Amino acid sequence: MKPDIHPDYHEVAVTCSCGNNFKTRSTYQGSELNVEVCSACHPFFTGKQKIMDTAGQVDKFRRRYGM
């Protein structure tokens, strides 16, 4: 790697709106970062995501277009 062309890579304290705190390394220029969603409260990671009723949507489409 060439010297003096890469951004500073340092430790950053991340705070989520749910109250979760963790540290990571980043090129973010501040020492603290506030986020709205993290892996502790995101629906994908918590398993509380809404499952879309695709079968109902297909039936609705077929009724609408006479298939």
Curated annotation (Swiss-Prot):
GO terms for biological process: translation. InterPro entries: Ribosomal_bL28/bL31-like_sf, Ribosomal_bL31, Ribosomal_bL31_A, Ribosomal_bL31_sf. One of its GO terms (molecular function) is metal ion binding. Keywords: Metal-binding, Ribonucleoprotein, Ribosomal protein, RNA-binding, rRNA-binding, Zinc. Coiled coil: none annotated. Binds 1 zinc ion per subunit. Zn(2+) binds at residues 16, 18, 38, 41. GO terms for cellular component: ribonucleoprotein complex; ribosome. It comes from the Bacteria. Disulfide bonds: none annotated. The keyword RNA-binding applies. Its cofactor is Zn(2+). Binds the 23S rRNA. Belongs to the bacterial ribosomal protein bL31 family. Type A subfamily. Part of the 50S ribosomal subunit. This is Large ribosomal subunit protein bL31. It comes from Thioalkalivibrio sulfidiphilus (strain HL-EbGR7). The gene is rpmE.
